[in-house]
Swiss-Prot record:
Catalytic residue positions: E226, C260
EC number of this enzyme: 1.2.1.82
InterPro entries reported in the protein's UniProt record: Ald_DH/histidinol_DH, Ald_DH_C, Ald_DH_N, Aldehyde_DH_dom, Aldehyde_DH_NAD(P)
Function, as annotated: Beta-apo-4'-carotenal oxygenase involved in the last step of synthesis of neurosporaxanthin, a carboxylic apocarotenoid acting as an essential protective pigment and leading to orange pigmentation. Converts the aldehyde beta-apo-4'-carotenal into neurosporaxanthin. Neurosporaxanthin is synthesized from geranyl-geranyl pyrophosphate (GGPP) through several enzymatic activities. Phytoene synthase activity performed by the bifunctional enzyme al-2 first produces phytoene from geranyl-geranyl pyrophosphate (GGPP).
Gene source species: Neurospora crassa (strain ATCC 24698 / 74-OR23-1A / CBS 708.71 / DSM 1257 / FGSC 987)
SUPFAM superfamilies assigned: ALDH-like (SSF53720)
Family per record: Belongs to the aldehyde dehydrogenase family.
The entry's keywords: Carotenoid biosynthesis, NAD, Oxidoreductase
Name of the protein described by the UniProt record: Beta-apo-4'-carotenal oxygenase
GO molecular function list: aldehyde dehydrogenase (NAD+) activity
Amino acid sequence: MAASKVEIAPFEVTPLDAIPAVCSTARATFASHKTKNLQWRLVQLRKLYWALDDFKASLMAALQQDLRKGGYESDFTEVDWVKNDCLHMINNLETFAKTEKLKDLPVTYSMMNFRVKKEPLGTVLIIGPYNFPIQLVLAPLVGAIGAGCTAVIKPSELTPACAMAMKEMIESRLDRDAFAVVNGGVPETNALMEEKWDKIMFTGSAQVGSIIARKAAETLTPVCLELGGRNPAFVTKKANLALAARRLMWGKVLNAGQVCMSHNYVLVDKDVADTFIEFLKIAYKDMFPNGAKASPDLSRIVNARHFNRIKKMLDETKGKIVMGGEMDESELYIEPTAVLVDSLDDPMMQEESFGPIFSIYPVDTLDQALSIANNVHRTPLALMAFGDKSETNRILDEMTSGGACINDSYFHGAVHTVPFGGVGDSGWGAYRGKASFDNFTHFRTVSETPTWMDRFLRVRYMPYDWSELRLLQRWTNKKPNFDRQGTVAKGSEYWMWYFLGLGTKGGVKGALMRWLVVVAGYYLSAYMKARRA
């Protein structure tokens, strides 16, 4: 379905002097406590769901205008994706928000009604990126609404049509005192960062993410950073090469490769490297029978600056282009391109491409592949592994990443119910599904001590009485089942607890079954003796 012709308002920067009032209103709304009401949150989420439906044509037209993103991807990866995310939050919010009773307590504290209340953090700032300008702004908003927070949203100025379409949608359908959109560039972002927030959610580059984190640290503001990295793909000789090529090709053409989780390079066993490259060419032809440039499905690079950044990588590489290579600045078009390299110093290996280009680096062994990947970027946002089970398990064991995908290209980050996040310098924190709710929630431990219990709490009051402490310790302190060398020891106490059925699998039910067997065995033995007599 093609994006409809829709008029989108010209990009309008929020006046700097208006920003403090916008933030103050959001804080005042949170302070009114109305967002803590679960029904209020559900109403806002339902309104957002239908707003996405009603503004779908506008949002898809904006995506076409900003990224030349086709209707298929706009619907599948942006608008419809967020609608499903909304429904998941709506359908599960009561469960997510339910107070948890704590049960793993010493018996002496079991009457104190320990529980964990899920409380909203407060007023949050959501700063979005340009690559998925709808999904990666509104998915965090779904979590913030579900958690009971108010939010100020700062979309990317690099996708101005999407920013204006979202501003109109959000401020016309949601509670304007609770949710607002601030548009602009660096000055407006700086002004927002001068405000006090209860959490900041940022999706974008590591360079800007570090600036956000440093500024947030000045006021001890927690942040969730979704960044990126030089993500590796591993292809061993035991992999299904045709499948690996097809799925990795998809990972580099979706949104023209402007995906933070897409692979930057492929470490392929040198014995199958040529075959893998041939399968890449077949996959390319299958996806673009008339060439990538003529395809209505392939997006374009967001702007000339990023086009030239990617072009520079291809211009300066010492490697061999084995697929693609065509570029057209007038259209911001870069053909899906694979470059065969033999040096870690090659520009293709030194920078995150964030586009439809990637390098292929042949390796002798999986040992070498893992060594290279850990050297290039120890904590990437994603890794993709194609091989047999022992190989993929080893890759998971010996390399850290925000997420990982076996036999596919970053699909671990495509499902709205599954936590998504980075690790190390590829990001902090996670969101989506329940993780989105948790991301904007404070888990508040509450205890409630009955007034009548004071007679049993003499142990904590001065003057202290050692005999009372020893008595308490006998009731509350558990004994270790291991010695000083860390070896588990099964002494007499273990066997006593085993036969009583406590602390073992099955618990009381297991104990009853064991004792029934013992008793039945006893009576059967007695019966047999009586028969023989």
